[in-house]
Amino acid sequence: MVTADETVLATTTNTTSMSVEPTDPRSAGESSSDSEPDTIEQLKAEQREVMADAANGSEVNGNQENGKEEAASADVEVIEIDDTEESTDPSPDGSDENGDAASTSVPIEEEARKKDEGASEVTVASSEIEQDDDGDVMEITEEPNGKSEDTANGTVTEEVLDEEEPEPSVNGTTEIATEKEPEDSSMPVEQNGKGVKRPVECIELDDDDDDEIQEISTPAPAKKAKIDDVKATSVPEEDNNEQAQKRLLDKLEEYVKEQKDQPSSKSRKVLDTLLGAINAQVQKEPLSVRKLILDKVLVLPNTISFPPSQVCDLLIEHDPEMPLTKVINRMFGEERPKLSDSEKRERAQLKQHNPVPNMTKLLVDIGQDLVQEATYCDIVHAKNLPEVPKNLETYKQVAAQLKPVWETLKRKNEPYKLKMHRCDVCGFQTESKLVMSTHKENLHFTGSKFQCTMCKETDTSEQRMKDHYFETHLVIAKSEEKESKYPCAICEEDFNFKGVREQHYKQCKKDYIRIRNIMMPKQDDHLYINRWLWERPQLDPSILQQQQQAALQQAQQKKQQQLLHQQQAAQAAAAAQLLRKQQLQQQQQQQQARLREQQQAAQFRQVAQLLQQQSAQAQRAQQNQGNVNHNTLIAAMQASLRRGGQQGNSLAVSQLLQKQMAALKSQQGAQQLQAAVNSMRSQNSQKTPTHRSSKLVTTPSHATVGSSSAPTFVCEICDASVQEKEKYLQHLQTTHKQMVGKVLQDMSQGAPLACSRCRDRFWTYEGLERHLVMSHGLVTADLLLKAQKKEDGGRCKTCGKNYAFNMLQHLVADHQVKLCSAEIMYSCDVCAFKCSSYQTLEAHLTSNHPKGDKKTSTPAKKDDCITLDD
């Protein structure tokens, strides 16, 4: 039987040698007092009792991962005791045949209890190093309080004797629970539940007694088989979580590399790739991956973000657990928060004019809050006011009401305001400390000396001041930059002369545009990573159908507009062709009238010559003969008139001829006959109707003279018909406010303004402007200015519609008239003065050539006209 001072127990799974090592060194008296035979007998008795207790109380748990538990009893085969060697250190030979390293146990000591109880706890520690052929190690430590510790594979198992279940292991390894052996009568009794602390003694015996011990302690074969099962289950426990993690990460890396190299996986998500790798690993090692997931070691992310760079923006791949629509429905139910009309308009404007409306709205709100804070601060503190308030009491009330609002805004805007840093030398202010530190590195010249920006040191030498910066402040000072004279607006290069800068700017601008075009990112560059991460979503069929219908409607509207424009163009072309035909007919009629006049003049000249010849012959015949046959003369004159084709004037001509014949009969002289011929010529010229009445449409300023009616004048501004020249002058003065101060005598010399294109003459400047636009498509500078002021009104000559303004726009849009600008040069008829404004010419005539001026000057030609420079 073992004494009460020794409670060292060692168990092994196979036949091994056991070395007992002391935890506390023995004294010399104890080692000399014990005898060898007594010690052997005590150990034998102790071994028999331990074997009986261990067979009933030892339990071995199975593999926790497979969910099976097995009970095994400890078996002791061989105990070898060596009493010739005592040592507190573990055996140096700690390796078996397989080379597995042995482990050393740590003695467990409990601290002393409370002093008022007056008892100390007995600490029993056992340290045992066991090695078998397979390298399994098991250490058991017993304590007086009924708990046993198993340190096999680094785990500790405790069992409480008061009907409590054993606690499970942390990492799921094998658990062994042993019951406390019955105390010997020679052991001290616990006092008040506390054990008495006593020293522990370990005894080592020689190897000579191994045979006797082996004969005594022969184990049962059944128990040996159960211990072998415990050994088999302890081998897979070495594959812990760390190794499983390493294997899983290695497999994930290999799988991702394989998927990355395949061209068909370019559009696959990163999260999908990771899930595929994990599924592949689950098929190979389901238990290890399951344990990693249960222990929350393997956690899949919901978001994978790529940081922004100079190539691409910030990209985030997100697989949310709950979509945003569900969150909104959970917060607000089926009814979403309704926006007011002003909020809807503001949101629509932001979406229309800004590519990122939400961020723009955030920045706008921050800016508005800052502006409101500054404004309310001025009102509350009565500073920077535009004017002095009239009623101070009302102003104080308003300021008192705005003060809490200002304080709220001030607290709200605190994150957006930074402290201003000021340079003591030059007064430069900035919110950035980095900018201020860079600014202070520059030398400051105050006009007469250099001033240090970090202290009060001054010096007149720039080099000494730089040395001061370096020696005192450890800063390499930089010279102050010179003020730019002629900098380039693009590259900020400075030039001494402006001309050199302009030449450089032209080339720099070309290079800048070319570089910008090269550096401009393309759509493929922006969407490269997006295409790799996820595919482009397919369009909804209904949305696609709506888009197609909208495209068809737009195409139809475009075709209709083109047809309408073509019809309008055809109508305008037909109207222009008709107008050209009318103009050609008028020109032909004018040419025919001129030919008739020329023929009449030739006929009258022939008649006059014939009359002169006949009169000369009559005189000679009168002198030679008394009577002359005058009938031949009358017949010749009538025949000549018939050849001319003038039937309307034959009566007047015949009357004149009869008078001439009567004069001839009365034997008047040749002078009277010549006078009659001249009078006939003048009367024919007066009574011959003018064919210029056909110019009524093109030259409205000319009067139409009928044979029995008064002359009619067509207004050159509004196309109104007016009888008599005096009424026409009154119409221009009252209706159009033109020719103010003019009298009827001023209109006797004809219209003063003439067109250089068609030689038509006009009374007013507005009539000339209207004629140039309608007939020739020329726009003067004054008319263009009127169009910009919405004052270009009037009557259209083409369609006859009246417009209060936008006449030029009507001509371009409706009649497809091509307008071009024209510069009118006005010249004075009296002197060589020329100008580009009609008002300037009027002022010149009024000041330099008044009506009462009798000075003779170069008369103005009848065909003087205004020159147009297109």
Swiss-Prot record:
PROSITE patterns xref list: ZINC_FINGER_C2H2_1
Record's keyword annotation contains Nucleus: yes
Ranges annotated as biased composition (Acidic residues): 77-99, 129-142, 203-214
One of the record's GO molecular function terms: histone deacetylase binding
Ranges annotated as biased composition (Polar residues): 9-20, 673-688, 695-708
Keyword Iron-sulfur assigned: no
Protein name: MOG interacting and ectopic P-granules protein 1
Native organism: Caenorhabditis elegans
Designated gene of the protein: mep-1
